[in-house]
């Protein structure tokens, strides 16, 4: 009986990935992050280190949707970088609310850019979408409408973002139990 070759063959056209200059344990781009912790536990500092240190200069664009982007002084270093990235009056990168239409346009534009880059045999640019502190906006996580196929653009981001060279970071505050809750 003839033995079949069971090795895996990698075909041309495999997904493009870009290594993080810091190496392990930082994943290659595109990637995604999900972090949930109580308030005051350093989530914003982790976010700033991811965007401004570990992946510094690797994103052609970074969009952030965060109610406190203009209020929280911790975000100043990120705001400074985003303001230098492009003219905010023509191409805003900072939003205080998540608008499914804006997210959809970002994803659709990036898909078109990636398609054109692949036709021209060019490397597609990596971009990043940051979603922070949106838990109190009830429609954000519950929405099932807005995406191209009838689903949420957040679902499109989570399921197909990597194919469009989109990395994404979702940060949320975890509710801390009150003392009476923990006493049982």
Question: What are the roles of these predicted feature ranges?
Answer:
Residues 81-87, 182-184:
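Short, conserved catalytic or adaptor-binding loops enriched in Gly and charged residues
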Residues 57-78, 83:
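AAA+/P-loop NTPase substrate/partner-engagement loops
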Residues 27-33:
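Pre-Walker A (Motif I) flank of P-loop NTPase domains
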Residues 1-2:
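Intrinsically disordered, low-structural-confidence terminal and linker regions
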């Amino acid at each position: 009986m003839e033995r079949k070759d069971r090795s895996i063959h990698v075909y041309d056209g495999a997904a493009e990935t870009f290594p993080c200059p810091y190496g392990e344990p930082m994943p290659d781009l595109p990637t995604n992050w999900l972090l949930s912790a109580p308030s005051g536990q350093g989530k914003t500092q982790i976010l700033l280190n991811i965007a401004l240190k570990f992946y510094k200069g690797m994103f052609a664009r970074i969009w952030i949707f965060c109610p406190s982007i203009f209020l929280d002084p911790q975000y100043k270093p990120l705001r400074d970088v985003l303001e230098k990235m492009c003219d905010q009056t023509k191409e805003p990168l900072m939003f205080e609310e998540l608008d499914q239409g804006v997210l959809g346009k970002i994803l659709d534009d990036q898909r078109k850019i990636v398609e054109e880059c692949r036709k021209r045999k060019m490397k597609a640019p990596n971009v990043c979408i940051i979603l922070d502190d949106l838990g109190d906006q009830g429609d954000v996580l519950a929405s099932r409408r807005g995406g191209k196929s009838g689903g949420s653009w957040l679902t499109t981001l989570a399921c197909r973002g990597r194919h469009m060279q989109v990395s994404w970071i979702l940060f949320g505050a975890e509710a801390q139990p009150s003392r009476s809750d923990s006493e049982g």
